[in-house]
Amino acid sequence: MEAVIYSNGNQECERAKILLEKLNFQISVYKLNQHFSQKGFIAEFGEEAEYPQVNVGFKHVGGLKETLKYMSDKGMFL
């Protein structure tokens, strides 16, 4: 399964990456000011969005907490 992380390089972004790697996701990390701008991030996810933002497949899951809940609900932590 594939996942995309929109990252600004903070600890939660790194935690999301480690978590997804441990669950054998193929990960693409898009980095602020390298792959997208803050303005583009806000346009895509809204002004209240925090880093990281995670997409699993074609589904936008949300931040790290939402990603953990999504994975738990899908039984990925068994």
Where do the language-model regions lie?
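Conserved residues at beta->alpha junctions
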Residues: 7, 32, 58
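Alpha-helical elements of the RecA-like P-loop NTPase motor core of helicases
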Residues: 14, 18, 39, 69
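Structural micro-motif
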Residues: 45-55, 64-65
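Residues at alpha-helix termini
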Residues: 23, 44-45, 74
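Non-catalytic, surface beta->alpha helical segment in thiol-disulfide oxidoreductase systems
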Residues: 56-78
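Local sequence-structure signature of Cys/Sec-based thiol-disulfide redox active-site neighborhoods
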Residues: 1-28
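Short alpha-helical
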Residues: 11, 36, 62
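Thioredoxin-like thiol-disulfide oxidoreductase module
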Residues: 31-48
